[in-house]
């Protein structure tokens, strides 16, 4: 959109959708089981798009979090424009955004995972005067049949290269998709923990992200 993601506005989102033939919008948000949930919207017209971007959409909180009772389960998921990205896997042109939870009174859901984290970060800042920087990483195993060619040494796979590391290309493809979706990647590499057992190769890989600065001003949950 020609500007840093943190500066994205509703007008930017609407303009991008209009100019790039985007036909669908996805809202995504984590539930109590730790998995991302998805709500799909077809863009009917400009007014409808403006409505969902402004007001979000109602969801059944009791189906998302075990601690919310069915009798008072109305929650709203409101998109954070700074998280917008083109879905690299969608066959229909789709713009996806992560959302924050709000209760029926328009207040941030106090028990929502992201809001809980932001409150903790604000308390940390108030007590210490320091800012908290979080740096995450993905560590995973790729499991495949052992073809017996150029075997890697067990537990010696740190920063290994092909042909001893078999799945570097898969890792770099994953990194490209993550970057396309707005992820800020520091680097990727093969990890120590590779081994072979029962005719299968287990290769450990890592994708590490750049530090992210969480500012207390984001407590409102709309940035």
What are these regions (language model features)?
Residues 193-205:
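Short, conserved helix/loop micro-motifs enriched in His/Cys and acidic residues
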Residues 1-190, 207-211, 215, 219-222:
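ATP/Mg2+-dependent ligation/transfer catalytic cores
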């Amino acid at each position: 959109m020609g500007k840093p993601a943190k500066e994205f506005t509703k007008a930017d989102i609407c303009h991008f959708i209009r100019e790039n033939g985007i036909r669908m919008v996805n809202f995504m948000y984590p539930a109590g089981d730790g998995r991302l949930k998805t709500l799909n919207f077809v863009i009917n017209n400009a007014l409808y798009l403006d409505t969902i971007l402004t007001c979000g959409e109602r969801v059944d909180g009791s189906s998302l979090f075990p601690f919310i009772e069915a009798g008072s389960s109305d929650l709203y998921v409101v998109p954070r424009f700074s998280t917008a990205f083109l879905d690299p896997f969608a066959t229909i042109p789709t713009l996806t955004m992560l959302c924050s939870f709000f209760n029926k009174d328009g207040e941030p859901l106090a028990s929502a995972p992201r809001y809980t984290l932001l409150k903790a970060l604000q308390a940390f800042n108030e007590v210490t005067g320091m800012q908290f920087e979080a740096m995450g990483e993905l560590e995973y195993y790729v499991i495949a049949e052992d073809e017996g060619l150029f075997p890697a040494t067990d537990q010696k796979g740190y920063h290994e290269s092909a042909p001893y590391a078999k799945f570097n290309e898969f890792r770099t493809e994953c990194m490209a998709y993550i970057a396309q979706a707005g992820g800020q990647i520091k680097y990727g590499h093969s990890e120590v923990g590779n081994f072979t057992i029962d005719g299968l190769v287990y290769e450990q890989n890592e994708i590490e992200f750049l530090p992210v600065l969480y500012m207390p001003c984001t407590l409102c949950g709309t940035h």
